[in-house]
């Protein structure tokens, strides 16, 4: 039989409970690792005699697609991160659940799973169905008032003893201290990635927060733009226009991310993205950009997206913070960016869908491009050869 929680005292007079709280507030908090905190807590509780067979902690995240993330631990498996979609908050899995009770009332919830009735939530019946005997959820409250549930469950036939319940309930404050900074950092990272893009977000989190924090790099640059947006905006209701823009932006952004690029800007009805040249070389970056355009072309064909044009170029850019001292923007600037902007105009004027510079064309297989003649590019001397990409034939389907 698993013993009740002990109140053992160490050589220096500190109880195990005090040591556990000190670990949560100190080393666990400073680890910055929610998986380590969760697994470490579970292992320590088990050593203290708590018959713990499941520990699940959920934490809110500021993300347009997710409502929460968390960690689930079991004695036979390593602790794993999970995510909870926004849609789940409206489903029967959450509504009326013990987690909802904890989050909305800030009070703990306990239920013996071998004594359930038909009125008890499905989550409890599911756990009982796989052998769990007792369930306890406690509130983990952060300084901003947001409450997250931490769930402890056991398969032990006698369930949790009163001493186990008291010990676990006493973890509310130290567990909050251990997890709050970790959760806030994850939310910050999520927000930065949402509004800046994953690449810029990583730079900002690494400390690139001042005007002039710029690195010189080489990148394949992709600029896409809807055809006929102005006429469309004059005849479409705002809700319909925004829905159309949203579908187009989603198709482009998903394609860019799928190929390892970064969406830097939504410029009216345009999207500016880059694919940094790494040790794999210029060809790899340009090929990734071509694959991204091909994905958008496929989406245009299957999802009835509005017509668009795209321009591609590769070259050196300055990548980082520009703006005023108090209002910064993380983006790319340089001649290469200006060139891709001029190429986008050529695409519109020529009737082509996807065009690229000679520099870009030289980095991809010749079968993907065909010349459409020479054109003056504002800001550059003379005329320069411009190419259409082979994928453009499919983008009008």
Name each region found by the language model.
Residues 57-88:
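GAF sensory/regulatory domain recognition
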Residues 133-141:
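Short hydrophobic beta-strand micro-motif common in sensory/regulatory domains
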Residues 163-216:
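Regulatory cytosolic signal-relay segments
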Residues 256-287, 300-335, 380, 384-386:
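Catalytic core of nucleotidyl cyclases, primarily class III adenylyl/guanylyl cyclases
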């Amino acid at each position: 039989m698993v013993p009740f929680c002990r109140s053992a005292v160490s050589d220096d007079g500190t109880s195990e409970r005090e040591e556990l709280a000190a670990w949560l507030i100190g080393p666990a908090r400073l680890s910055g690792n929610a998986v380590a905190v969760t697994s470490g807590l579970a292992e320590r509780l088990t050593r203290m005699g708590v018959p713990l067979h499941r520990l699940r902690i959920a934490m809110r995240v500021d993300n347009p697609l997710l409502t929460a993330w968390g960690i689930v631990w079991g004695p036979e498996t390593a602790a794993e991160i999970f995510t909870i979609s926004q849609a789940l908050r409206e489903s029967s899995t959450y509504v009326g659940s013990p987690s909802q009770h904890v989050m909305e009332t800030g009070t703990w919830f306990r239920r013996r799973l071998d004594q359930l009735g038909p009125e008890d939530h499905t989550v409890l019946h599911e756990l009982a169905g796989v052998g769990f005997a007792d369930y306890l959820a406690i509130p983990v409250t952060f300084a901003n008032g947001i409450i997250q549930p931490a769930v402890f469950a056991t398969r032990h036939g006698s369930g949790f003893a009163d001493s186990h319940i008291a010990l676990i309930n006493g973890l509310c404050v130290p567990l909050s201290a251990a997890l709050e900074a970790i959760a806030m950092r994850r939310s910050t990272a999520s927000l930065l990635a949402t509004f800046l893009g994953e690449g810029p977000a990583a730079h900002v989190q690494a400390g690139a927060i001042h005007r002039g924090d710029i690195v010189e790099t080489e990148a394949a640059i992709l600029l896409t733009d809807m055809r006929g947006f102005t006429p469309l905006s004059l005849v479409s209701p705002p809700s319909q226009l925004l829905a159309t823009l949203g579908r187009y932006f989603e198709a482009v952004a998903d394609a860019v991310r799928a190929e390892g690029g970064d969406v830097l800007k939504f410029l009216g009805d345009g999207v500016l993205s880059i694919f940094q040249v790494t040790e794999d070389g210029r060809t790899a970056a340009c090929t990734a950009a071509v694959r991204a355009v091909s994905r958008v072309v496929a989406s245009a064909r299957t999802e009835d997206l509005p017509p668009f044009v795209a321009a591609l170029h590769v070259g050196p850019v300055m990548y980082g913070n520009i703006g005023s001292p108090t209002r910064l923007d993380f983006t790319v600037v340089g001649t290469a960016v200006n060139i891709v902007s001029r190429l986008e105009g050529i695409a519109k004027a020529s009737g082509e869908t996807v065009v690229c510079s000679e520099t870009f064309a030289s980095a991809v297989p010749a079968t993907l491009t065909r010349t459409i003649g020479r054109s003056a590019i504002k800001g550059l001397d003379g005329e320069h050869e411009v190419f259409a990409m082979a994928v453009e034939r499919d983008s009008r389907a």
